[in-house]
């Protein structure tokens, strides 16, 4: 697919010009989560009769493609923008609109048959959609990345508890020497603490 933002859409272009601060881009995980919000909104709007089925399917197809990371290059905006994330929300609305236009054989930027505001952003406020996307991205990050790493950490502590069971060290309490213990016991305590991450599930 060609680069949709060779000629940037209006809202995205304005944001790049108004917030030309550093180079920290919006995390792709957040973009993907926001695309899921757009997908869910389109389905709900269609069920309520607010959006016709054809446009719903076009938005859903484009949103899924974005959520799967197929169009990450189309999101050049920085994290430095207004606090509500309005610019990123509009960036995504414009990308989904253009993807739908392209799929329908219409020129990019035509906003036909899917308009960024009237259809992609239908029944949404950035003040709701963006925080919801943050929560979705956080849950996915915890589930897919953090929890598996914590499982590995717990296993590593268990292995060290066994490997270090004969190494005696002095305990420390309030920066003073305390009761001796083995390094294995200390590693075992770390392992016990690490099991608490299961509450995140």
Tell me the role of every PLM-derived stretch:
Residues 1-201:
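Conserved, well-structured ligand/cofactor-binding cores
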